[in-house]
Amino acid sequence: MKRWQSWLLLAVVMVVVFCGYVFLQLRTIEVERLSDDLWVLRGLGGNTAVLRTDAGAVVVDTMLLPLQGQRIRQLARELTGADTTQLINTHYHIDHTHGNPAFEPGTRVLSTERTLSHLQALDADFWQGEAARLLPTETFSDRRTLSVGGKTIELIHPGAGHTDGDLVVLFRDEGVLHTGDLMFNHYYPNID
């Protein structure tokens, strides 16, 4: 077999394996209720938070693919009975942001300034056309407190950690902290 054919076969096998992996993840999402109005979605390669407010759902981290984002959007609607009005990206890595385009135009998207800067610089090809509408629309550098539909959410940039634009999300009323990739269970996080 010619060398290029071997590489092509390897690429096809990798694509098939990856598609199977994504399909299995979408079928095996574990939903855990943390409070009356807060859920965590597990099984997408990370944790996505979904908060019900009187002004719609708030989603933290949308995962790797628009297909995963569609599933998150669907689950958020089922859990909260409302459309998602706000997305929060804890950092710029694609496994936390590339589901954004699955959400409706006009969805408020929040991140740190550094996260937006990295998304625009490092991943510019992805964020063209329709996807550009779901880049972060509001940014901050240090800390921001949101009042959303009767809920208080604090966005805190603790400094450089996993990336230089990390943020943690404190759901004040629920007493829950979403740490993005700053904390892992049973191992240490990577640092860029």
Outline where the language-model segments fall:
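Zn-dependent metallo-beta-lactamase
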Residues: 3-55
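Conserved beta-strand hairpin/beta-sheet module of binuclear metal-dependent hydrolase folds
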Residues: 32-75, 167-171, 175-181
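Short catalytic-loop micro-motif centered on adjacent basic/acidic residues
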Residues: 40, 58-61, 85-89, 154-155
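Solvent-exposed loop/turn segments at secondary-structure junctions
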Residues: 45-47, 57, 64-67, 92-96, ...
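Soluble non-cytosolic domains of exported or imported proteins
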Residues: 63-70, 94, 134, 192
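Active-site HxH/HxHxD metal-binding segment of metal-dependent hydrolases
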Residues: 74-145
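Core dinuclear metal-dependent hydrolase active-site scaffold
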Residues: 139-176
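Cap/insert and terminal regions of metallo-dependent hydrolase folds
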Residues: 186-192
